[in-house]
Amino acid sequence: MGLGNPGRRYALTRHNAGHMVLDELFRRHGGRWRRARRAEAAEVSVEGREAVLLKPATFMNESGEALSGYRAEDLIVVHDDLDLPAGTVRVKVGGGAGGHNGLRSVISRVGNGFVRVRVGIGRPPEGADVTGYVLGRMDRAAREAIPRAADAVEAVLEEGPEAAMNRFNARA
């Protein structure tokens, strides 16, 4: 599942990092987008492993509504993260929402036992509005992380979460 807001207005914003990563995975693995329950979905095959790319058609704060019938242990949730420097990609299993309303909605639906691929967008400048920042256009460093975040999703699917964490969470 890639977190983001629907519509062109939000397509290139920091908060839509999750949607951008799913678009990259779709570009790599093909498939066809179809309308599913409260989401757009595409079935793809990654190294012989079937996966469903799911982009909620709801706004961020209601992202969990698209998860009817899914279990936490079957999910990889890709999302923007203010607490990581722009361009950083990290893999994590479990944890809280950390102030992210999309994650809060997902956790309220399925619990917190899912894998996360976190795309760093950095913090806004001192005194700047956080909402305006996350809904602002993604900068170059964060955009360049999108293919690496797609690599991280593929690594989770192919090698498992532990191996993906070892690979993507290593300090450079």
UniProtKB/Swiss-Prot annotation:
Residues with site note (Discriminates between blocked and unblocked aminoacyl-tRNA): 5
Marked site (Stabilizes the basic form of H active site to accept a proton) residue numbers: 80
Keyword presence, tRNA-binding: yes
Protein family per UniProt: Belongs to the PTH family.
Pfam families: Pept_tRNA_hydro
Catalytic activity: an N-acyl-L-alpha-aminoacyl-tRNA + H2O = an N-acyl-L-amino acid + a tRNA + H(+)
Active site positions, chain numbering: 15 (proton acceptor)
InterPro entries xrefs: Pept_tRNA_hydro, Pept_tRNA_hydro_CS, Pept_tRNA_hydro_sf
GO BP term, pick one: protein quality control for misfolded or incompletely synthesized proteins
Function: Hydrolyzes ribosome-free peptidyl-tRNAs (with 1 or more amino acids incorporated), which drop off the ribosome during protein synthesis, or as a result of ribosome stalling. Catalyzes the release of premature peptidyl moieties from peptidyl-tRNA molecules trapped in stalled 50S ribosomal subunits, and thus maintains levels of free tRNAs and 50S ribosomes.
Record-linked SUPFAM superfamilies: Peptidyl-tRNA hydrolase-like
Top EC class, one word: hydrolase
Its EC number(s): 3.1.1.29
Annotated HAMAP family: Pept_tRNA_hydro_bact (MF_00083)
Protein name listed in UniProt: Peptidyl-tRNA hydrolase
Organism listed in the record: Rubrobacter xylanophilus (strain DSM 9941 / JCM 11954 / NBRC 16129 / PRD-1)
Residues at which tRNA binds: 10, 59, 61, 101
GO cellular component term of the entry, any: cytoplasm
UniProt entry keywords in alphabetical sequence: Cytoplasm, Hydrolase, RNA-binding, tRNA-binding
